[in-house]
Design a protein with these regions (language model features):
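Primarily recognizes the serine-hydrolase "nucleophile elbow" in alpha/beta-hydrolase
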Residues: 108-183, 190-191, 195
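Short beta-strand/loop motif that positions the catalytic acidic residue
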Residues: 202, 208-210, 214
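N-terminal cap/lid segment of alpha/beta-hydrolase-fold proteins
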Residues: 1-48
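Short substrate-entry loop that stabilizes the transition state in hydrolases
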Residues: 44-50, 56-96, 137, 215-216
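Catalytic nucleophile-loop/oxyanion-hole region of alpha/beta-hydrolase
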Residues: 64-73, 84-124, 252-259
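Acidic catalytic loop of the alpha/beta-hydrolase fold
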Residues: 173, 213-217
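The conserved beta1-alpha1 loop
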Residues: 56-59, 113, 210
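C-terminal catalytic histidine-bearing segment of alpha/beta-hydrolase fold enzymes
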Residues: 36, 96, 219, 223-289
Length: 289
């Protein structure tokens, strides 16, 4: 006799996605790419156009879950921001797609926010791009590299985010240690998309977080990028998480690491003037009520 039916575990991130408003930010060959949007409650919203946190899920450009950063979105909406989870093309859902398409979609996403800033009630000069792994490369490339635009984009509108937060990002695409080398259509594009080659002064402020035991995307790629970028007088905060592997920051993997990285982001956003300090920070539950 079979045992009792087991209720499948709830994917909390996917459940949180249902609390967002869905819009279409881009259509490619008849396929719509959605963005999920969270707004702050009226008592949490600032009396001026809001800052935006735009999230791009982790991937190796083959697959990924758009709901991954939904917990982050809910939190930062509670801090007075408009938050968004953007879809972008990966090969599992869009055959033939790869890193170049992801890069183009990230640029399109930032432009979409700027071009619709009035309707969205947001500040087009306070857009933070956030991404992990291949999604981190996509949004970082919008901040660092020229080109890689979608032919349908209005290129007069800047795709450069005003700040960037990266989780175990792919920064190195060209060296022999670079991950996911087989995902590129050719060596020329892999070399052109290498973020090391774009390092110069004038980058938007960045926060990079990476686990030292990452066996998927090498830790040294982020560490070396942060060091070289800082030498160009850019703001490039780097936090290493000793003994942590790939994806250590995810809500469903480790709440402790999720919370630690979330607070690092919060402090970074406050430092940049994108949100106000949390008046309840450091208070116990009863004190914060």
């Amino acid at each position: 006799m079979e045992g009792p039916l087991r209720t499948p575990p709830i994917d909390r991130s996917r459940e949180l996605l249902k609390t967002a408003r869905e819009e279409i930010f881009k259509s490619v060959n008849g396929v719509d790419l959605p963005v999920y949007i969270w707004e702050p409650e009226p008592d949490k919203a600032p009396p001026y156009p809001k800052s935006v946190a735009a999230f791009f899920f982790s991937s190796g450009w083959d697959n990924g879950q758009i709901a991954q950063f939904a917990p982050h979105c809910v939190y930062f909406a509670s801090r007075g921001m408009t938050t968004m989870c953007f879809d972008y093309r990966v090969s599992a859902r869009h055959p033939g797609s790869g890193p170049l398409q992801a890069m183009a979609d990230a640029r399109s996403a930032i432009r979409w926010i700027r071009m619709n800033a009035v309707e969205l009630g947001v500040n087009p000069g306070k857009i933070i791009g956030v991404g992990g792994s291949g999604g981190g490369h996509a949004i970082a490339s919008a901040a660092i590299l020229n080109g890689f635009d979608d032919p349908s984009d209005v290129t007069d509108c800047s795709p450069v985010p005003n700040a960037v937060v990266l989780f175990n990002p792919v920064m190195d695409t060209w060296s022999r240690h670079a991950p996911y080398q087989d995902r590129w259509p050719d060596n020329a594009s892999r070399k052109a998309a290498d973020l090391y080659r774009g390092i110069k002064a004038g980058f938007p402020p960045m926060l990079i977080m990476h686990g030292t035991e990452d066996r998927v995307v090498p830790f040294d790629g982020s560490y070396t990028f942060a060091r070289k970028s800082s030498k160009k007088k850019n703001i490039c905060r780097f936090i290493e998480f000793d003994g942590k592997g790939h994806g250590f920051f995810n809500f469903n993997l480790s709440f402790e690491m999720y919370e630690a990285t979330l607070m690092a982001m919060d402090e970074f956003f406050v430092e940049l003037g994108f949100i106000e300090p949390d008046p309840n920070a450091g208070l116990g539950k009863d004190e914060a009520l």
